[in-house]
Amino acid sequence: MKFYIKTFGCQMNVNDSEKMAGILQTLGYTPTENWEEADVILVNTCSVREKPDQKVLSALGEFKKVKKHNPNAVIGVCGCLAQRAGYEIYQKAPFIDIVFGTTNIHHLPNLLEEAKSGNKAIEILEEIDENENLLDQFPTVRENKYTAFVTVIRGCDKKCTYCIVPTTRGRERSRRIGDILREVQYLVEDGVKEIHLIGQNVTAYGKDFGDVKFWELLKAVAEVDGVERIRFTTGHPRDLDEDTIKVMADLPQICEALHLPIQAGSDRILQAMDRGYTQKEYLQKIELLKKYIPNIALSTDIIVGFPGETYEDYLETVKVIKEVEYDQVFAFKYSPRPGTPAADLPMTESPEELSKRLNDLINLQKDITFKKNLEYQDKIVEILVEEINQENKLVGRTRTNKLVYAEGSPEYLGKLVNVKIEKVNRFSLEGSIIGGD
């Protein structure tokens, strides 16, 4: 029996899908890259913007075809969209067999058994399942052998007016350090070199416990023998403190890269979003980061066209981009999410104007990214070789999260090696291996 999982959305969803794959393998299923031959198809959904919603329904329409030659195939929908609108999805696609949300993934074996018995298995919990940590006991099935996501906190207590995540993922719930370290140890023994700590608001880790802080978790993970690199995503600017930044600077395992979403540069819009900081306060965090970690590579998220945004507000965002000089910016037009406070606010600019602002912003960032990449020309950088591509190039990332294609021997796969950068592109670097461990 075979399974296929289609994943939309963030790293948390990717990690959830890895856990689902682990559950299915435990049940005797094997993965397939061809959904047409799958006995179980799961669609792990995202609800952060409208476009992923549409993609999910399109994918389901395609997957429906599997039932023609395999009537007993099970099709399931899970994740954030399922948590928010699972019953609506089922009404639109009644051929679905399973629907479940974000906190009861560990119920998948029971739901699958119910569906295989010929029943519809729909379980969307209004409250967080008190046994959701049982999910962490299952192995992950990863595409990447040498890097791994580790969920350290679930949910978000922030109430940003545009965001559906607190509704779909619930309040913040941290995992105990001991549980996290056991998972990290298992991953290292499985060959993982780089640990990527993730959460909807990873820098809030431990606040619900009151007896442990995020920087203490970073130190503990760094002490696990065999952990060569540590990254973490995504933090909220309000929860990033100087103690954490100092630990980032002090621990050699922590990579010099950080994703710190600003969302908008205008204080008026930031207040309307209920982000809890001003432009000045955000830039003070950036200043601290650059003070302690001068070579840090920064990335951010930006929403263009939040209700009420004027051109002057937009220019404040442009000003921040120019001042910070991010290595990467993930920018999107505002997408109203049903059930959020901002969804009731009227749009004040035309779609054409918002598209122009977004395109101008993206083009500005492309130039900044290329300028930042040019600094790597003829430099020697460390990469973790993660794979070999179809052109027989080694593929890896620098500590600053730059994608590198390198000439070198396959023996370097899974190793930290030095690469001399010989060519700089807008979104990647190219070079040759000059040594390895």
UniProtKB/Swiss-Prot annotation:
Main location: cytoplasm
Cofactor(s) required for function per UniProt: [4Fe-4S] cluster
Database matches in PANTHER family: CDK5 REGULATORY SUBUNIT-ASSOCIATED PROTEIN 1, MITOCHONDRIAL TRNA METHYLTHIOTRANSFERASE CDK5RAP1
Record protein name field: tRNA-2-methylthio-N(6)-dimethylallyladenosine synthase
GO molecular-function term, one example from the UniProt record: N6-isopentenyladenosine methylthiotransferase activity
Catalytic reactions of this protein: N(6)-dimethylallyladenosine(37) in tRNA + (sulfur carrier)-SH + AH2 + 2 S-adenosyl-L-methionine = 2-methylsulfanyl-N(6)-dimethylallyladenosine(37) in tRNA + (sulfur carrier)-H + 5'-deoxyadenosine + L-methionine + A + S-adenosyl-L-homocysteine + 2 H(+)
Residues annotated as domain Radical SAM core: 142-371
One Pfam family it belongs to: UPF0004
Keyword terms: 4Fe-4S, Cytoplasm, Iron, Iron-sulfur, Metal-binding, S-adenosyl-L-methionine, Transferase, tRNA processing
GO CC, alphabetical: cytosol
InterPro entries attached to this UniProt entry: Elp3/MiaA/NifB-like_rSAM, Methylthiotransferase, Methylthiotransferase_CS, Methylthiotransferase_N, Methylthiotransferase_N_sf, MiaB_methiolase, rSAM, rSAM_horseshoe
All copies of domain MTTase N-terminal, residue ranges: 1-117
Domain TRAM: 374-435
Binding site for [4Fe-4S] cluster 2: C156, C160, C163
Functional summary from the UniProt entry: Catalyzes the methylthiolation of N6-(dimethylallyl)adenosine (i(6)A), leading to the formation of 2-methylthio-N6-(dimethylallyl)adenosine (ms(2)i(6)A) at position 37 in tRNAs that read codons beginning with uridine.
Residues at which [4Fe-4S] cluster 1 binds: C10, C46, C80
Subcellular location, record wording: Cytoplasm
CDD domains for this protein: Radical_SAM
Family classification: Belongs to the methylthiotransferase family. MiaB subfamily.
Subunit-structure text: Monomer.
Cofactor stoichiometry and binding remark: Binds 2 [4Fe-4S] clusters. One cluster is coordinated with 3 cysteines and an exchangeable S-adenosyl-L-methionine.
